[in-house]
């Protein structure tokens, strides 16, 4: 199975849980996350503007309401816009609230393609994975072709237990 095929299978696996909601730009309108959400019910898709801080903030709120959010960040370059929500809200709410609140989300983050067409330039292909590991205290997983579905399965288990996970995809692998 191709890398993209595995991503699609992983999204279908997540969607089998009725509490899962996919959040992001292009998840419902304009491509359904590059086709990887084609078989997911519209009722599980929440389309947002290109506003990464909003996406993660929305995910935090949905998690507190008992849902299981999966945020699609189409280019890692723009995760920087979401760091306030990731570090100071999603990542710190449990400590700030003395364990009263424990929001969690899956962050699906894509590094843009550098070696395959369409090269989208230096502002759409940066990899901040190592830097993010220095400031985010939940697991960050770089997806390999042979483990895409299993890594998303583990992320869903962690999510159900109240732990966030960031999964990093490489568009060049598609």
Model-assigned labels for residue ranges:
Residues 1-174:
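Thiamine diphosphate
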């Amino acid at each position: 199975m191709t890398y993209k095929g595995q991503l699609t299978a992983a999204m279908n696996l997540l969607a089998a849980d009725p509490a899962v909601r996919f959040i992001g730009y292009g998840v419902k309108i304009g491509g359904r996350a590059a086709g990887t959400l084609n078989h997911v019910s519209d009722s599980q898709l929440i389309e947002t503007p290109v506003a990464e801080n909003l996406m993660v903030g929305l995910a935090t709120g949905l998690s507190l309401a008992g849902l299981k959010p999966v945020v699609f960040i189409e280019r890692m370059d723009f995760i920087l816009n979401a760091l306030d929500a990731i570090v100071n809200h999603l990542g710190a709410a449990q400590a700030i609230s003395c364990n009263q609140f424990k929001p969690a989300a899956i962050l699906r983050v894509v590094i843009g393609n550098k070696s395959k067409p369409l090269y989208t330039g230096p502002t759409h292909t940066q990899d901040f994975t190592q830097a993010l590991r220095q400031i985010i205290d939940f697991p960050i997983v770089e997806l390999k072709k042979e483990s895409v579905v299993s890594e998303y399965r583990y992320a869903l288990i962690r999510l159900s237990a109240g732990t966030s996970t960031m999964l990093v995809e490489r568009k060049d692998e598609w």
